[in-house]
């Protein structure tokens, strides 16, 4: 479908889609973007979320104005997907008709025609009222703290990727003594044109825009209205594959096929099974925990790494090795049968570092699904430190070199790059392949998402600053048994948000036991 088919587009967009295309506010999805939308089309993934705490409260009018300024500068935050076969798209995307052929021409995306604060703030949306009641009740019972139970409740939220009244993300406002003023929020995204780093950028932009408001703002009925604001709105950025070369080397395919064959036959699998998100709630239960490492403890960890490893070493390999060693110590996960010798670690990696050195272009891609990944399959036995404690620091140094080399060689681009190659898009139905690779497969390894350390500088004249950040996600249909979301600040330290399922760990109490072992090892390896 190369021509605009207005008959099949969402009705909310029919009148102005052509105008939006001409203005740079609508276009075909890129192939990288389509991969993340496919997870939603097939109900294989729900959301990631980031908790952010500011130093002071903002009013409803301040929040509306701040969001308006952020969205005008970053139109990606206003986008929705225009599905084929509206409004029967959900059934169509999971039909034999859709699966029967490839779809190299992707659906359109466009900005919303209008957006009110009620279209963003999840508290005010009746379809989420039952979950919101539980979230606010838990927040009150925890005396204003972000807890593992709140995170677990957010994993049940489905954010529509097709609008029509809201974007592909939402904001939960957590009230304390003031019901109409907030300083604690949760950014929830379905991963369409958004990633963990996008959510961190959101809170930094929110802080900056609130600081830019010097006088009480007037009441705004809309965050954005296309017919009035289109001239103020920046153009949507081009698909990221047009500015970054994702193409893998020629040997990538045979190497991947060989390593995949070996891994599939030798990997350890748990009792947990991947399934569509609706089925998870029927047959399994998500379990969650949050580990906080205080700023003092965090500095001690960094000092410990520095004293034991020559040269520069990031914290990610330390987190990775400590996690697998903890699984060994725990003794309730790695129980391999014959020939189950391998596990895997899947580490998302930001692609923005590969953008051209141009400030304007880098600003354009602050928001988006601009993340690749590196993954490798270590031997389970190498993390057994009962009789080999002297191998602990050399193992961390080894994986630091492995990760660093992968990033230097741009391997984090290659997995996505293979899936967006022209011949793959032309001959393969990506949605069907995703389902075939996931549904019914047993969970095994770990997803480790470290979105980074974000130091907050003291600015005497600034009313608003960031006090805390915590990133987490349930891995959905990805085959990993565990998800670890890591985010750090110099104010509240490092937060590690852990998710798994009862079929993997047994119970919530078992996960808490595992996380206690992990925290103890992080603090005193």
Curated annotation (Swiss-Prot):
Major alcohol O-acetyltransferase that uses acetyl-CoA to synthesize acetate esters from various alcohols, producing ethyl acetate, isoamyl acetate, isobutyl acetate, butyl acetate, hexyl acetate, heptyl acetate and octyl acetate. The alcohol acyltransferase activity is promiscuous with regard to alcohol but relatively specific for acetyl-CoA since ATF1 does not use any other acyl-CoAs (C3, C4, C5, C6, C8, C10, C12). Acts also as an efficient thioesterase in vitro with specificity towards medium-chain-length acyl-CoAs. Keywords: Acyltransferase, Endoplasmic reticulum, Hydrolase, Lipid droplet, Membrane, Transferase. Found to be inhibited by cadmium, copper, zinc and mercurium divalent cations and sulfhydryl reagents. Inhibited by the addition of unsaturated fatty acids to the culture. GO terms for cellular component: endoplasmic reticulum; endoplasmic reticulum membrane; lipid droplet. GO terms for biological process: acetate ester metabolic process involved in fermentation. Understanding the biochemistry of the volatile esters is of considerable importance in industrial agriculture, winemaking and brewing. ATF1 could profoundly affect the flavor profiles of wines and distillates deficient in aroma, thereby paving the way for the production of products maintaining a fruitier character for longer periods after bottling. The most important acetate esters from the perspective of fermented foods and beverages are probably ethyl acetate (fruity, solvent aroma), isobutyl acetate (sweet, fruit), isoamyl acetate (banana) and 2-phenylethyl acetate (rose). Belongs to the ATF1 alcohol acetyltransferase family. The lineage of its organism: Eukaryota, Fungi, Dikarya, Ascomycota, Saccharomycotina. InterPro entries: Alcohol_O-acetyltransferase, Atf2/Sli1-like. Changing residue 191 to A: Only moderately reduces the thioesterase activity. Coiled coil: none annotated. It catalyses: an aliphatic alcohol + acetyl-CoA = an acetyl ester + CoA; a fatty acyl-CoA + H2O = a fatty acid + CoA + H(+); 3-methylbutanol + acetyl-CoA = 3-methylbutyl acetate + CoA. It is found in: Lipid droplet; Endoplasmic reticulum membrane. The keyword Membrane applies. Residues 24-41, 508-525 are annotated as: Membrane association. Optimum temperature is 25 degrees Celsius. This is Alcohol O-acetyltransferase 1.
